[in-house]
Amino acid sequence: LSVNHDYFETDGHPLAVVGTTYMSSEVQRLFFEHPNVFMWNQDLGQIHDAGLNMIRTGWWTGWDKFCDENGQPYERTLRTLEAYLMTARKYGLPVQFNFFAFLPDVLGGNNAFLDPAAVRRQQTLISAVVSRFHDVPFLAWDLINEPSFSQHLWTMRPNGDPIELAAWNEWLDKRYPDRVKLAAMWNVPPQSLAGTISLPSEMEFSPRGMYVGVNSLRVNDYILFAQESFAQWARTMRATIRVTGSQQLVTVGQDEGGIQDRLSPAFWGSSVDFTTNHSWWQNDYILWDSLAAKQPGEAMLIQETGLQRELNLNEIARRTPENEAALLERKVATSFIQGSGAIEWLWNTNSDMTESNETPIGAVRTDYTEKPEATLLREFARFAPSLQEHLRDPQLPPIAIVTSQASQYSVLADFQLEAQRRAVRALTYLARLPAYLVAENQIQRLGNPRLVILPSPQALSDTAWAAVVKYVDTGGTLLITGPVERDEHWQIRHRAVELGLKAHAEPLVYHNAELKLGERRISLAFGQQQQSWLDSLHFDDGSTLREMPHGKGRIYWAVYPVELAEELQSAAELYSYVATRIDIAPPFSLLAPLPAGVLVFPTVMSDSVLYVMSSDSDEDAAINIRDQATGAALAFRLPAQHAAIAVIGKKERRVVAKYGF
């Protein structure tokens, strides 16, 4: 089991991952306390017969049963894992094994990631387990499932212990050796930073803290401190694995919080061998889930996906089993857009869970009857072998969306996240232009897109701004929507003026505005929250979109944060206008109109073009398109809220593999 820059491989051949999570149908997460190889053999045989090609497993609870207080695993623990791996090997199933869940605090210490004593015991556990199985070729290690940085799970808040406080101050001293300058950045009196600098308080994470004398300008630094500290922990654990002689894959299993305000693959991705995302709740942003988790030059896997049960107020399920399966179909299909595939959570439903949204998750019920999800997974598994032979050398789309972490790691994060999501939908669903995402701290790995879009940034670090301007200088085209006149500490910058534009930022305090695109006028409307917090740009000549040469490239600058206007079509029209100006056309032509809720996303491979189509519409859609690269036509009916995949061979100029039609 290995990875290249984009996909998994087995024995050197691409693998389209269609897997599941499995512990035991009998005792679920207690399978190490109560191992039953007879049940494993039965269940893994069923998974194998379904055609699935990878399983994820590991420890989510009960670590005190697996090892002593120093982290040394018991011999029975290692023998249990050996039996599990032998059973998986019998059925040819690669295994991802998870060590910790949420916070690795089970081995004591004052801070799970920063306390040397705690980290040493974690290394003992990992080292002992990996040493025993370091040469198992079908095994990968997941360091921790859905990590949070502190005891305040699923948020980015300080733990508040002395070790964290000391590490925070050490980090600040290295990053900002001049306390007077740091005070200016944070807009506080210099004397307030004398001595030990406290961790941010809860009020500082509130956008209204400034009204009670507490500003939030330290939040960005705290989040960067947490990101870098966790990335260092991941590097330490990966190095611990490598010392054993293991060359097995290592990852971190993060959920959607990682691409929002928690520990992000944009930071820890370089510490592991592939990145992940767990697509659970962001059902309206399934594509964004994948694009944001994918890091430049590194494979990405949707490592958990499934259906959390949605309930009405009377505790009755909102979705039918068939509708749940349709949503899972869209998630699995979309996982092949710049991703390696998906692992479903969970094969057997876990009736021991205490929350009603989790109890029913799984393809096989406790009475061993199957949900429609199981049939769906079998269908994807049958398709995977015909897909994976084409998963080679994917080309990046010509458009990159650069995300602002300066805004995303502020107390106004929701605006930047919404700008990203709406930019993705406007480009791909409405303008029919595929794109990829690059986070601000990854800007040096941008590549060579023909167009970079900076959607409603409001703020950006000086380093990132210099990088995008350099991209333009070397011949690229940049589209900015709204101002970018602040840095990560919300300090004023005069970036438009520095580019030779007579312009300034001002508060966006109106509901209606117009954006002029040549002879066309696009109406924009901004809601209450946008009027309360956002800025717009004002050009002295009254124009609303400027086009200007810079170096060898060009900059298009719209004065409004268009992605955050109420009507999404406005952003799509702006994107199409700029793309047309620089001769970027959709990679397929529409032979018949498509509903706005239908995604058609092509990826050019070395020998083919991979088309993923997903419907968010309430009506069936007649897909009738022609691929521009091959001239091949694609025509079929896509059922409402379902997905389909087609592979068009470049030599054959026709569909050579398909799913869903």
What is each model feature region?
Residues 255-264, 425-445:
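A short, well-structured beta->alpha microelement
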Residues 135-266, 271, 289:
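Polysaccharide-binding and catalytic clefts of secreted carbohydrate-active enzymes
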Residues 333-413, 421-434, 499, 503-528, ...:
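Aromatic- and carboxylate-lined catalytic core of secreted/periplasmic carbohydrate-active enzymes
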Residues 124-125, 234-249, 266-352, 369, ...:
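Catalytic-core region of carbohydrate-active enzymes that cleave or remodel glycosidic bonds
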Residues 36-107, 116-121, 126-128, 234-244, ...:
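Aromatic-lined substrate-binding rim segments of carbohydrate-active enzymes
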Residues 324, 456-661:
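A conserved amphipathic helix/loop scaffold
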Residues 1-54, 68-71, 378, 389-390:
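N-terminal carbohydrate-binding accessory modules
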Residues 105-109, 205-221, 291-327, 348-367, ...:
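Active-site clefts of carbohydrate-active enzymes
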